[in-house]
Regions:
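Short alpha-helix capping/helix-loop boundary micro-motifs
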Residues: 43, 88-91
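Short acidic/polar mixed-charge low-complexity motifs
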Residues: 47, 76-78, 129
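Surface-exposed, glycine-biased beta-strand/turn segments
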Residues: 1-66, 99
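Zn2+-dependent peptidoglycan hydrolase active-site motif and core
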Residues: 51-87
Length: 139
């Protein structure tokens, strides 16, 4: 794909769990081997989560496994799914956000990852398929 405008990491922190769409990784919380179609980035509870790029908020939902989640469709064609948030109070569906705007804060709402240290679960999609954010975002 043609690279769109640069994306930034929504939080700064150590990578706890990397992207693994094809190779299974063991989930301590779920007690099973499974794909991990995003990345888990260590962050303090309450740490601000930023929009990786400009776009429109398309979903604000409470996912049964991934917790409070905000989805942004970026102008570049990418889509970001930011999960394990503290609440859904920062943005609403239809809001336009610019790169770096606050879209939430880190929480512990993801039941499927509750045994991990506080973190943001971040999925990046292009044309409906999950891709490794580390292959697109530099730094």
């Amino acid at each position: 794909p043609t690279p769109g405008p640069a994306l930034i990491w929504p939080v700064q922190g150590e990578l706890l769990t990397g992207f693994s769409k094809d190779a299974l990784v063991y989930s301590e919380t779920m007690g099973q081997w499974q794909a991990h179609e995003g990345v888990d980035i260590a962050a303090a509870l309450g740490q601000v989560v930023a929009a990786p790029a400009a776009g429109t908020v398309t979903e604000c939902l409470e996912d049964m496994l991934m917790g409070y989640t905000v989805v942004i469709r970026h102008d570049s064609g990418y889509e970001s799914r930011l999960s394990n948030l503290a609440s859904l109070n920062a943005v609403s569906v239809g809001d336009r956000v610019q790169q770096g705007d606050t879209v939430g804060s880190v929480g512990q709402s993801a039941l499927s990852e509750e045994k991990l240290a506080p973190h943001l679960h971040y999925e990046l999609m292009l044309n409906g398929a999950q891709i490794d954010p580390a292959r697109v975002i530099k730094g």
